[in-house]
C-alpha cells in the first residue's frame, strides 16, 4: 500500500516535486495546502514556462485538484497545526512554503498528525540535513524531520565529496552562477538586498549564498574550509557551481576528470553525471541529476584546481526531494 503524502506550499518546488511524486508507485499525494485559489494552482501545475506542459490531465473542483483522474484535496490553512493530517492518514509532509524551516515550524505538521516532514530548504537549528549520494547513510527510522539542503548544496557536495576523498581538500571557494528566482525583482524595486532590488532579467547580480558553508553539514570534515558567493544571472532555470580548491597534493586535470567519471558511473550514479560535451545552460534544463560535471572546464595548476558542475536548480532539486520522500516513506 502506498504511503500517503501531503505537500505544504505549492510553489515552484512544490509543483515540480509533485510531478515527480505522481509517477511513484511507492507514495501517493493525497493533499496539498496552499493559500492560492485552486483554479490558479491547477493552471500553474498544467502549464510551466521552464519545464513545459504537465504530461497528463489536470482539472479541478472548488476544493480539489483532479490529476490523471485522481482527486487530491486542497486546503488553505495558514497554520499547519490545523491541518487534518492524522485524520486522512498522511505520513510524510513536504514542507515547501519557505516559512517553516526550524523544528518548531516543521513540528506543526507532526502535531497535526503526520509522522515525518521533509524540508525543501536549508534548515535553521538542529535539523538533520541530507544530501542524497553524500550522507544519506545517516538516515535512520528515528528521523522525523530532515532537510533536503539547497539546490546548490546538492550540486556542490558530490563534487566536494569526490575531491576530498580522492585528493583531500585544504580550502576552497565557489561561485554559484544561479538562475534568477522569485526572491528578486523583475523591475527595479525595493528589496532588503539592494542588488536583488535590480531587474532580474537584464542584470548579473552578485549576492550571498550559504551553500558552501552548508557543505559542512553533510561533509563535516570540510567545516571552515569552503566559502563562496552567488551570481544571479538572467536565465529562468539552469545554474552552475564554479568551484576552486587547494588540494593536499598536486594533481592533473586528467586525474580529476577520471575520479569524477568513476564516481558518476559508480557510487554516485544518478546523482552525479559526467560529460565531456561542450554544453551550455539550456542543455541541462529538465535534467534530474544533482550535478552535471563538465570535464571540459577542469583545470589544474599544482594543487590548485577549478571544476564546474551544472544543475537544473528546479528539476534536479525537486527530483532529489521526491527521492528523499520515498526514502522516508
Where are these regions (language model features)?
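Short clusters of hydrophobic/aromatic residues that line enzyme substrate/ligand-binding pockets
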Residues: 65, 130-132, 145, 187, ...
Amino acid at each position: 500500500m502506498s504511503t500517503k503524502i501531503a505537500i505544504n506550499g505549492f510553489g515552484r518546488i512544490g509543483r515540480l516535486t509533485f510531478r515527480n511524486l505522481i509517477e511513484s508507485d511507492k507514495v501517493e499525494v493525497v493533499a496539498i495546502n496552499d493559500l492560492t485559489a485552486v483554479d490558479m494552482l491547477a493552471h500553474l501545475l498544467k502549464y510551466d514556462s521552464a519545464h513545459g506542459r504537465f504530461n497528463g490531465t489536470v482539472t479541478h473542483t472548488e476544493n480539489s485538484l483532479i490529476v490523471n483522474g485522481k482527486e487530491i484535496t486542497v486546503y488553505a490553512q495558514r497554520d499547519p497545526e490545523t491541518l487534518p493530517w492524522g485524520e486522512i492518514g498522511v505520513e510524510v509532509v513536504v514542507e515547501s512554503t519557505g516559512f517553516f524551516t526550524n523544528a518548531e515550524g516543521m513540528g506543526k505538521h507532526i502535531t497535526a498528525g503526520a509522522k515525518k516532514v521533509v524540508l525543501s530548504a536549508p534548515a535553521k537549528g538542529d535539523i538533520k540535513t541530507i544530501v542524497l549520494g553524500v550522507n544519506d547513510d545517516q538516515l535512520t527510522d528515528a528521523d522525523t524531520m530532515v532537510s533536503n539542503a539547497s539546490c546548490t548544496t546538492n550540486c556542490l557536495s558530490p563534487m566536494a565529496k569526490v575531491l576530498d576523498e580522492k585528493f583531500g581538500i585544504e580550502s576552497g571557494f565557489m561561485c554559484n552562477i544561479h538562475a534568477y528566482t522569485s526572491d528578486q525583482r523583475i523591475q527595479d524595486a525595493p528589496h532588503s538586498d539592494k542588488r536583488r532590488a535590480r531587474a532580474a532579467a537584464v542584470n548579473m547580480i552578485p549576492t550571498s549564498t550559504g551553500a558552501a558553508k552548508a557543505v559542512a553539514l553533510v561533509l563535516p570534515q570540510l567545516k571552515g574550509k569552503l566559502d563562496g558567493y552567488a551570481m544571479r544571472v538572467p536565465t529562468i532555470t539552469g545554474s552552475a557551481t564554479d568551484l576552486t580548491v587547494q588540494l593536499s597534493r598536486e594533481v592533473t586535470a586528467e586525474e580529476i576528470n577520471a575520479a569524477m567519471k568513476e564516481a558518476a558511473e559508480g557510487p554516485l550514479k544518478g546523482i552525479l553525471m559526467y560529460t565531456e560535451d561542450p554544453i551550455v545552460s539550456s542543455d541541462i534544463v529538465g535534467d534530474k541529476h544533482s550535478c552535471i560535471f563538465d570535464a571540459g572546464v577542469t583545470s589544474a595548476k599544482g594543487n590548485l584546481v577549478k571544476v564546474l558542475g551544472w544543475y537544473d536548480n528546479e528539476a534536479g532539486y525537486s527530483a532529489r526531494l521526491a527521492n528523499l520522500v520515498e526514502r522516508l516513506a
